[in-house]
């Protein structure tokens, strides 16, 4: 069962590993990222950041969608993390039903539009969010930590 979906360019870090894991009683984190899934060093760092009480999957989009749709994680409390909205849009297009996405930290550079203190989006991010919004089935919200109030996210 999917208990949380978050966009966070840092993937698994203290806030996600501790606060969200405890609040949502996560038993498995799934990092969905084509590049990270092929990088042994990044996967090792993610393993070290994952709480001992949780399992970790680091998968490319296609494999993540295949496993979720096959019910592989139905008996677990799954928390999905991705760096970019495009990744989650691809997951949705592959047939994974997501009902809400927590828009967390997205890196800010000179080429991006800043949305608040912790979110920076480029044209690709904006297009992905607009397509997700147009589906009408996914609630987008911002909530940095479980103790913060959730706010609707609109592009």
Region spans (language model):
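Short, hinge-like loop/turn segments at secondary-structure boundaries
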Residues: 47-49, 75, 118-119
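Ordered, amphipathic secondary-structure segments that act as subunit-interaction surfaces
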Residues: 59-104
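General beta-strand structural signal in soluble alpha/beta enzymes
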Residues: 5, 31, 57-60, 80, ...
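Long, hydrophobic N-terminal alpha-helical segment
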Residues: 2-55
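Glycine-rich, aromatic-bearing surface loops/beta-hairpins
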Residues: 85, 93-94, 98-155
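Generic hydrophobic/aromatic pocket-lining and core-packing "Φ" positions
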Residues: 17-18, 88, 129
């Amino acid at each position: 069962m999917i208990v949380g979906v978050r966009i966070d360019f840092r993937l698994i870090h203290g806030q996600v590993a501790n606060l969200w894991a405890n609040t949502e009683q996560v038993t498995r984190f799934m990092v969905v990222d084509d590049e990270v899934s092929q990088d042994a060093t990044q996967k090792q760092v993610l393993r070290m950041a994952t709480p001992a009480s949780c399992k970790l999957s680091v998968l490319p989009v296609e494999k993540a969608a295949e496993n979720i749709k096959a019910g592989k994680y139905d008996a677990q409390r799954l928390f999905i993390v991705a760096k970019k909205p495009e990744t989650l849009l691809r997951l949705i297009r592959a047939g994974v039903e997501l009902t809400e996405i927590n828009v967390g930290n997205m890196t800010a550079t000179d080429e991006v539009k800043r949305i608040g203190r912790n979110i920076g989006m480029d044209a690709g991010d904006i297009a992905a969010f607009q397509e997700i919004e147009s589906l009408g089935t996914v609630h987008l919200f911002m909530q940095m930590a479980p103790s913060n109030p959730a706010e609707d996210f609109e592009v």
